[in-house]
Each structure stands twice: as C-alpha cells, then as structure tokens.
Amino acid sequence: MKRTFQPNNRKRSKVHGFRSRMSSKNGRLVLARRRRKGRKVLSA
C-alpha cells in the first residue's frame, strides 16, 4: 500500500503557501488568526 504523504515542495507551496493564503478572503483570515495566536511560522 502506498503511503499517504508523498512529499512535493511545489504542491506544498501551491496549497499551503503564503501567496495562496493571501489570494482568498478565508486564507487571509487563517493568517490573521495565526498572527493573533503568535505563531512563529504563518504558512508553509
């Protein structure tokens, strides 16, 4: 059986990256929430 995690940095950035977060309203809400919580890393 194939494992579920098949690392791929390009896909990682496209799905979870900063620019993809900024491109939608809900993504911006995610970043705002993480800033408020005090996360050192906001996105992948």
From Swiss-Prot:
Report residue spans for region: Disordered: 1-27
Q: Which GO terms describe its cellular component?
A: ribonucleoprotein complex; ribosome
Q: List the disulfide bonds.
A: none
Which is a GO BP term held by this UniProt record?
translation
GO molecular function terms listed in the Swiss-Prot or TrEMBL record: structural constituent of ribosome
Q: Which domain of life is it from?
A: Bacteria
Alphabetized Pfam families for the sequence: Ribosomal_L34
Q: Which InterPro entries match?
A: Ribosomal_bL34, Ribosomal_bL34_CS
List keywords of the entry alphabetically.
Ribonucleoprotein, Ribosomal protein
**Annotated Basic residues bias:** 1-19
Task: Please name the HAMAP family in this protein's record.
Answer: Ribosomal_bL34 (MF_00391)
**Protein family:** Belongs to the bacterial ribosomal protein bL34 family.
How this chain assembles, per its entry, is: Part of the 50S ribosomal subunit.
What protein name is recorded for this chain?
Answer: Large ribosomal subunit protein bL34
- Look up and give the organism this protein is from: Bacillus subtilis (strain 168)
